[in-house]
A protein has these predicted regions:
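Gly/His-enriched, cation/cofactor- and phosphate-binding structural elements
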Residues: 2-122
Length: 122
């Protein structure tokens, strides 16, 4: 819809390539970008909250075309920033670094670019 387009246009997404397909990264407090990007066919979406520093990485659900697994990304990010709280969802399709619901979680010091570099390599 139009609203989607407006939201999309105000956000500067960074597009990158992964072995699973195209990814896109955002620095925004707007969580709807993840759903929008997935609708547009991005296999991997990263959102970093510029205020709190938290990161969310999501992949598309398993399909004939793609079956992404964030385990190696999780291990690599844990090595790079062991202080931060990293949580790999049981389905291996979602990697969270802190949520608003858990105030004890420590946001990562890594920049969005650092995280994108890992996603490009792994």
């Amino acid at each position: 819809g139009n609203m989607d387009q407006t939201v999309w246009n105000t956000i500067n997404g960074r597009i990158f390539e992964t072995r699973y397909g195209k990814g896109i990264g955002f620095e925004t407090i707007n969580d709807t970008v993840i759903k929008l990007a997935q609708k547009m066919g991005y296999v991997l979406v990263v959102r970093k909250d510029p205020r709190k520093g938290y990161v969310r990485i999501k992949t598309l659900p398993k399909s004939d075309k793609v079956d992404a697994d964030l385990t190696l990304v999780y291990e690599q990010l844990k090595k790079m920033d062991p202080e931060a709280t990293w949580f790999l969802h049981v389905g291996k399709k979602m990697l969270l670094n802190g949520t608003a619901k858990n105030p004890k979680m420590i946001p990562t010091k890594l920049k969005l670019d650092d995280i994108i570099k890992v996603l490009e390599k792994v």
